[in-house]
């Protein structure tokens, strides 16, 4: 009772079992702890709400926080989220009934989806980033992944843009589906139960982005597509997945005996891809045509060992020019244990390893990049 309102949960649920006269009933109690904009309503959990504004715009400029309570689908509408907006999502398992078979099933509730001619435009600023996270602001939930599903840009959606944004505590960060388009600028995606960024036959451009504590892959690119990453840092410390996975395959059966192929083109400049395991880049090309997995890395720090063995992709480093293949002895970051992925000011291997990109003059913190020999990764060293 002595805590400020800002740390009160937005939604509280309690499941009660009531026994009376030999009967048993189950009751769900719900309470709301803060004044907020609940979408589609305070009673939207377990439901799907589609918003259509006939090609217009829906601007989330209310000073109150926004709570996605259920599944929110944007169609034929540009959802514009201005700087400083706080978006919380109430996740959890929901129950539904298949209309054909009549059988019930459970699914992960709580996500934002963009479909058809919908478009997501997030316009945060360095001083006032837009934050997507779970709806439990209490300190004990701060480091818990998988509390809501994530952001899903479905097939064919164009013009999606996310700038100066933090996405955390979800199952996935952002998924971009077939022929969908996304530009990321100054975005952080972390503390996810699955992959941070997923592209499936998609078009993604990212600059000055940071991915870490993603239990799956930090960056996962499947079934081809076009991808460009500049000054990005993707790490995978203490988890099983690699910092980067790239594939031109879509499995059509459980054992992937049946599959489809689509060309992948990926370009990385001034990026850092590292983690605790010896291999932080994973490749899969099921075609004998090497051009269907077309990738190049320039002025990047990577970490590979088994990937470049004769029975894998021994030619990888020839497409990584110039690159530094990191070892456990190499220092890059200031404090991995504290999730501080700024560069060590004394001995970071990323120091002055980059090449100038005229269109990107500042780092994720807003520091000016060296015009002649910038640092690799999303942060520039400040001496």
Q: Each PLM stretch: what is its role?
A:
Residues 12-19, 151, 165, 346-350:
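Buried hydrophobic-core signal for structured, non-transmembrane domains
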Residues 60-61, 74-86, 92, 97-99, ...:
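Beta-solenoid repeat scaffold
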Residues 89-90, 135, 168-171, 190-194, ...:
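Surface-exposed loop/turn segments connecting beta-strands in extracellular beta-rich domains
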Residues 208-342:
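Predominantly extracellular beta-rich ligand-binding scaffolds that present long acidic/polar faces
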Residues 60, 79-81, 119-124, 159-163, ...:
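All-beta strand scaffolds that present successive hydrophobic residues in beta-strands
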Residues 1-52, 56-60, 64, 72:
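Feature for long, exposed domains in two main contexts
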